[in-house]
Design a protein with these regions (language model features):
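Conserved active-site and SAM-binding loop architecture
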Residues: 1-174
Length: 174
């Protein structure tokens, strides 16, 4: 990460401390016998814990919360039967992404996507529904770390529903 050197200058042990918190999460999950996961953005955690079991972007769960329409690849390490949720993307988000991929061959930052689609029938769709980069563009502030570390609500709901089969059975019975 581009911030590692400044973090390391402030605290040479910052990465070890983060790994310790992740290991504590893993141990509590194992001791409790429940599904568990810890997350971290793409980082050096893979050199400590191995490759992530699952990765996602918040926009992939906009079917459960449209406020999460942004990019931020996040890695999960999981255990004890954790079930990764199925993607649940809002149809308009999916259509906007498809339009950009059709025109450009791949996803790209929203500003570039809007420029590339400008003047086409998809311009409004992409402007309104294409995932933004708010996390990466978040200016330095006292709240930046909290904004970047907040769990996306749509993903949190999807994880809960995937890992609470007893509640799904109650819902089906109702």
């Amino acid at each position: 990460s581009r911030w590692f050197e400044s973090k390391r200058a402030k605290d040479p042990h910052f990465q070890a401390k983060a790994a310790l918190v992740a290991e504590q999460c893993r141990m509590v999950g194992l001791a409790a016998g429940c599904p568990w996961a810890f997350e971290n953005p793409v980082s050096v955690f893979s050199s400590i814990f191995g490759s992530a079991d699952y990765t996602f972007h918040p926009y992939q769960f906009t079917g459960l919360c449209t406020d999460d329409n942004y990019t931020k690849q996040t890695c999960l390490w999981t255990g004890n039967g954790f079930k990764a949720p199925a993607e649940n993307m809002h149809p308009m988000v999916e259509a906007a992404i498809d339009a950009v991929k059709l025109a450009c061959g791949r996803m790209m930052p929203k500003k570039k996507a809007i420029e590339a689609i400008s003047g086409t029938s998809f311009a409004g769709l992409v402007t309104d529904w294409y995932p933004d980069n708010r996390i990466h563009e978040c200016p330095p502030s006292d709240e930046r770390a909290n904004i970047r570390s907040a769990t996306p609500l749509g993903f949190a709901k999807a994880v809960f529903l995937s890992n609470a089969p007893h509640l799904n059975k109650k819902r089906e019975a109702a």
